A protein has these predicted regions:
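Short, surface-exposed loop/turn segments at beta-strand-coil junctions that are enriched for proline
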Residues: 113-122, 134
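Contiguous segments within soluble domain cores/interaction surfaces
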Residues: 48-112, 128-131
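Short beta-strand elements
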Residues: 135-153
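A cross-taxa feature marking solvent-exposed loop/turn segments within ectodomains of secreted
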Residues: 68-70, 120-122, 143
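Short, compositionally biased P/S/T/A/G/V-rich stretches that sit at domain boundaries
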Residues: 2-64
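Exposed beta-strand face motif in extracellular beta-rich ectodomains
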Residues: 123-127
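Generic detection of short hydrophobic beta-strand segments and adjacent strand-loop junctions
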Residues: 88, 112-114, 148-152
């Protein structure tokens, strides 16, 4: 590197994942609140925002340990382009936040926030939450929730 040449590294770190201990319990059950389904919006987006404001949506969700969404995402911010939804941000972006909490017993909520960056093009947007819920028999089922569409000016 010091002489402008790449280094060659032949060492591969050992995979210790099977030897790691965890004291966290597994997920026993997820249940939506009465009269709700997984993916339902409990607190929706407003109709209009400007760059610099934060959109916040609360979804009925399952425990995130049901599926860690590696190589996937819990959150998508999408923009309507030529009649189709295009993803412009995911949960790995600095502008988004995904906050999960157990509300009561087996009920959970996910608060998804998007701090609209400066320079965001005007248009129609929405927030999508992807999650997974575990029933009493241990079956894990994916679901999707979508906010109302909103305008960014």
């Amino acid at each position: 590197m010091a002489q402008g040449r790449p280094t060659t590294n032949t060492l591969t770190p050992a995979d210790l994942s099977r030897q790691q201990m965890t004291f966290q319990t597994g997920v026993v059950l997820d249940a939506p609140p009465l009269l709700h389904q997984f993916g339902d919006v409990k607190t929706d987006a407003a109709a209009r925002y400007t760059a610099g404001q934060t959109v916040s949506v609360v979804f009925v969700t399952g425990h995130p340990k049901n599926n860690l969404h590696r190589n996937d995402t819990f959150v998508k911010v999408q923009r309507l382009v030529d009649g189709a939804w295009k993803t412009v941000a995911v949960d790995g972006d600095w502008s988004t936040q995904y906050r999960w909490k157990r509300v009561f017993g087996a009920e959970s909520e996910a608060q998804v926030s998007w701090a609209i960056p400066a320079g965001t093009p005007a248009g129609t947007y929405r927030i999508v939450h992807q999650g997974d819920a575990r029933n009493l028999l241990g079956t894990i089922t994916p679901f999707t929730g979508t906010s109302r569409s909103f305008e960014v000016n």
